């Protein structure tokens, strides 16, 4: 299933670029490397497909991804009009989402991938730091 997730993510993110101008698929692949279980790795690779691509939950179901994986991907999808910390609190209710979001934040907080960080990048880093503290609390139980 992990190989299927990688192929699906590569296809879905094709042509997308990150804030540093690099192919976007590198981000979910790096997040995956910070995860331990196969389930975490699958969610990591797919964590932005619902929010940032045309992939639907129905397609993921047809591809054979479990209900738990699909529910976790829904949990990791930032809803329109939802405050960022509200989104983080929602993630804190799902242990699998918590573990993947922690890895996601670690990668998002690495400003070395952005050639010339701006004030906006540093403000985003501060927001991510607050989220990371809350996610770490959730990880401790």
Can you annotate each of these PLM segments?
Residues 1-141:
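Active-site helical microenvironments for divalent-metal-assisted chemistry
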